[in-house]
Amino acid sequence: MYIKDSYLSNQLCFLLYVTSKEVIKKYTYYLKKHDLTYTSFMVIMAIENEEKINIKSLGRRVFLDSGTLTPLLKKLEKKGYVQRMREKEDERNLQITLTESGINIKPTLKAISDQVFEDFDISQDEKDNLVNSLKHVISNNFDYTTH
């Protein structure tokens, strides 16, 4: 589809919005088969295998607050992908780890991510340049450590 040259079509915010919406729509299509949302995908992929991470650190990693993460993690726990454990020394500190199922689904989720970008008419170089540009914008302009 061609975007007509206009004021709106030259606005970075609009272009990021459309791109994000369409990419997430593709992810949603593939993730539906695994009863996962895009946000669930992000959380599973953000937790390293064998890692214990608290909600605050996980939230910083995926740019989500604890109010959004808590119900999502409860759903992922019910589905068997993560385990939530309270620290014995500090009951307020909730640690999250991937279960065996969570670790085992990661290759499938990576394949979905690869498929999403294969579905778009974008070269590897274009993708790499876009990713690097967006990382630069995020790291130089947004501080999520306060959330």
From Swiss-Prot:
Per UniProt, what is one GO molecular function of this protein? Answer: DNA-binding transcription factor activity
Q: Which residues bind DNA?
A: 55-78
Subcellular location, in the record's words?
Cytoplasm
Q: Which domain of life is it from?
A: Bacteria
Xref: Gene3D superfamilies: Winged helix-like DNA-binding domain superfamily/Winged helix DNA-binding domain
**Alphabetic keyword roster:** Cytoplasm, DNA-binding, Transcription, Transcription regulation
Is the keyword DNA damage in the record?
no
| InterPro entries (alphabetical) | HTH_MarR-typ, Transc_reg_Sar_Rot_HTH, WH-like_DNA-bd_sf, WH_DNA-bd_sf
A GO cellular component annotation in the UniProt record: cytoplasm
Q: Where is the signal peptide?
A: none
Q: Where is the HTH marR-type domain?
A: 9-139
Q: Which family does it belong to?
A: Belongs to the SarZ family.
Question: Protein name, please?
Answer: HTH-type transcriptional regulator SarZ
Q: Which organism is it from?
A: Staphylococcus haemolyticus (strain JCSC1435)
**Lineage, highest ranks first:** Bacteria, Bacillati, Bacillota, Bacilli, Bacillales
